[in-house]
């Protein structure tokens, strides 16, 4: 049975604002949060929107990435985030938590009901293969139907994992990413996301070949913000980099304390009082 949801004016305005960010010239950086605290930190830092990271949410719940987090857990986390920040929130929807496009639509409806205004929908499977592009197109079309039903212009960010999964030669990856990106845009996606480590020339080729706003991910090969903006990249995601950085620091801290060294923790200037003041609205 289809759940009936009510979209209020505030959520509708957030959706419109988030869509405009993709339609306006110039690149914006969107950080990926894994809980309400990280989303709140990003908002206070001045970011105009935040997205979730499936990897980060999985790590925060004690799991590896790769479709380990249930839809119920995702709904819980997203509701906590949207209840704490005022900026638009986009959700890493993985493959939509279903293969049936109509079930993907209903799953998206449930996430919209807790305040989401955007979705990353990917074609990469946990076994390292790409889903058939025809199936991905049907899922995108189902989300477009939901937009019309709710009169809510939420952002569909269609992700293709040709580079992320390192499928084929360099030329084959580029051709497949461009082919899928254009097919997804034609199906109704508002933006095309091609994550993966890539150089400047690959980024330029993707901007040129994909006839839709392009989203790339921060990576160690080429991460010149000004250079990416000049190429025409519209959206730059931090991905799971920040949460992995914090996990690494926490692991080091745990090892130090286990070995009798608490200097790093005790020397922190982020006192109890400062922490409470920071998170006080």
Predicted features and spans:
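Extended, intrinsically disordered, low-complexity segments
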Residues: 2-11, 18, 241-281
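Alpha/beta enzyme core
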Residues: 3-238, 245-251
